């Protein structure tokens, strides 16, 4: 098939281009900077926030399937607010441009990335895809992020393309914040990520390789809707954070009184470590015939 990968320089998009080509697909890489493009059958250049540029680039590629892997999370270590603000625009404006361009170019299918950790913290510790999103989060930044996620998912569902949203778990592996040289790892190594009392917030992790594998399966499937793409072992912070510190060779995380956590860690990290819900991957396994090659974070988190 002719496949266009938007966001082809990212931690998932870059290896995804190669994985799709290895499966025999003809792959166009949509990038902002041609010098950073992976090896592809065609490279098309456009800023995803420039409607006319996107329409032109996608038209030139003539894809049957468009894969949306656009984020600005490369900015996360240096400028987190800007990274989240730009990613929100890519999820709203960028998605709208891709949907319009895909339709105009005659594509039949759209696969878009989302996140599996945007659910409201209510109900059981591990939730399925029907759980409500946390659009009314008390933190303005996180509420804006989740509203952008909701808009992306709405745009994909309301298009007349066969649309599938892959809600990725918290990514680890090369190029992520949880890599040994990533921002989260450096914070843990410096003893600057304490564990709030209880540590009951649940995280569903996902190795980058498994995100790529799920995206390939999604391109080749006819599944539609939203799917959680996560590993098999959702874990409370009280389990994964000490394990991660040991694997990195860092000191054990100190315990932090719950009342101090928001002031010292910020709202989002406190939410992740204390109240966040995990995500069940049963539907993705069934709909895509996919399963993680890294079924547990215990086997890889902090090792690469």
From Swiss-Prot:
A GO CC annotation given for this chain: cytoplasm
Inducing stimuli: The avenalumate biosynthetic gene cluster may be dormant under laboratory conditions.
Catalytic reaction(s) noted: 3-diazoavenalumate + NADPH + H(+) = avenalumate + N2 + NADP(+); 3-diazoavenalumate + NADH + H(+) = avenalumate + N2 + NAD(+); (E)-3-diazocoumarate + NADPH = N2 + (E)-4-coumarate + NADP(+); (E)-3-diazocoumarate + NADH = N2 + (E)-4-coumarate + NAD(+)
UniProt entry keywords in alphabetical sequence: NADP, Oxidoreductase
Transmembrane regions: none
Gene3D superfamilies, alphabetized: NAD(P)-binding Rossmann-like Domain
Domain of life: Bacteria
EC numbers for this chain: 1.-.-.-
GO molecular function, one term: aldehyde dehydrogenase (NAD+) activity
First-tier enzyme category under EC: oxidoreductase
Signal peptide: none
Entry similarity comment: Belongs to the NAD(P)-dependent epimerase/dehydratase family.
Free-text function comment from the UniProt entry: Oxidoreductase involved in the biosynthesis of avenalumic acid (AVA). Catalyzes the denitrification of 3-diazoavenalumic acid (3-DAA) to produce AVA. It can also act on 3-diazocoumaric acid (3-DCA). Can use NADPH or NADH as a reductant, with a preference for NADPH.
PANTHER family tied to this protein: NAD(P)-BINDING DOMAIN-CONTAINING PROTEIN-RELATED, PROTEIN YEEZ
Name listed for the protein in its UniProt record: 3-diazoavenalumate denitrifying reductase
Native species: Streptomyces sp
Gene name of the record: avaA7
């Amino acid at each position: 098939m002719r496949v266009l990968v938007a966001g082809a320089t990212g931690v998932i998009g870059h290896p995804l281009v190669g994985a799709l080509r290895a499966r025999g697909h003809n792959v166009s890489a949509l990038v902002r900077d041609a010098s950073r493009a992976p090896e592809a059958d065609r490279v098309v250049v456009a800023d995803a926030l420039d409607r006319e540029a996107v329409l032109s680039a996608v038209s030139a590629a003539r894809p049957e399937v468009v894969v949306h892997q656009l984020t600005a999370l490369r900015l996360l270590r240096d400028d987190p607010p800007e990274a989240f603000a730009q990613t929100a625009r890519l999820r709203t404006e960028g998605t709208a441009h891709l949907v319009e361009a895909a339709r105009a170019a005659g594509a039949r299918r759209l696969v878009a990335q989302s996140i599996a950790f945007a659910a409201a913290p209510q109900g059981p510790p591990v939730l399925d895809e029907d759980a409500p999103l946390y659009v009314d989060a008390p933190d303005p930044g996180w509420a804006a992020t989740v509203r952008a996620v909701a808009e992306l998912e709405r745009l994909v569902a309301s298009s007349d393309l066969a649309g599938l949203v892959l809600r990725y778990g918290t990514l680890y592996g090369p190029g992520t914040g949880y890599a040994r040289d990533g921002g989260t790892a450096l914070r843990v190594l410096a003893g600057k990520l304490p564990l709030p009392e209880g540590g009951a917030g649940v995280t569903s992790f996902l190795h980058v390789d498994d995100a790529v594998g799920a995206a390939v399966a999604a391109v080749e499937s006819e599944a539609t809707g939203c799917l959680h793409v996560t590993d098999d072992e959702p874990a409370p912070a009280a389990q994964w954070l000490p394990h991660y510190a040991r694997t990195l060779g860092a000191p054990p995380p100190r315990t932090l009184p719950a009342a101090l956590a928001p002031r010292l860690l910020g709202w989002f990290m406190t939410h992740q470590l204390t109240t966040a819900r995990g995500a069940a991957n049963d539907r993705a396994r069934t709909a895509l015939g996919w399963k993680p090659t890294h079924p547990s974070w215990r086997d890889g988190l902090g090792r690469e």
